[in-house]
Amino acid sequence: MSKKIIECGLSQKSIQDAIDQLKVYQTELNNKNELFVKRLSELGLEVVQTTMESIPDEEKGSYYTEIIYDKQGNIIGSSIRLSGNNVLFIEFSAGITYGTNDYPLPSGNSYGMGTYPSKKEKSDWDNPNGWWYTDESGQSHHSYGNRAYMPMYHAEQAIVIAVRKIAKEVFG
């Protein structure tokens, strides 16, 4: 928003006019803040939905996205609800044995394939032949792991890239 100057004299009417102008400005600022949060939420949800739709059905389970409103109808955030056996792996992966790049974190560290600490000197995450595990019933299964699709990471990156542009569009 551009700089707003409100001038007033010392008369009662002038002070009341300044108060009225401040109330209008407060309403405008609240409306713009709501639009700003809505635009960022919509962008994040769009990226999450696009990422989720790219995931094979057997890996993603089901998901639901929504924009969250308070009792007055103001947008206060967005929500993504996942259900299924492998939902954590959608963001973080598990036992992946094929190459993907690491992703940088704001702290300067990275996460990605093989970055989770293991108690063994060498984990199985980089075995090109995959690995075997035994399920609860004692049945052995072969796996190449679950890829990290990272819908939340990609949504965060899209928001970080667009936040200044959207702020300029909304606040002028």
In which residue ranges do the predicted regions lie?
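Short amphipathic alpha-helical segments with heptad-repeat character
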Residues: 23, 27-34, 38, 153
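Non-globular disordered terminal and juxtamembrane segments underlying protein topogenesis/assembly
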Residues: 33-51, 163
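Generic alpha-helical secondary structure signal
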Residues: 13-16, 20, 35, 153, ...
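N-terminal, Lys/Arg- and Ser/Thr-rich interaction peptides
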Residues: 1-28
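Charged, low-complexity interaction tracts
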Residues: 2-7, 57-172
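Amphipathic alpha-helical hairpins
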Residues: 24, 28, 53, 57-58
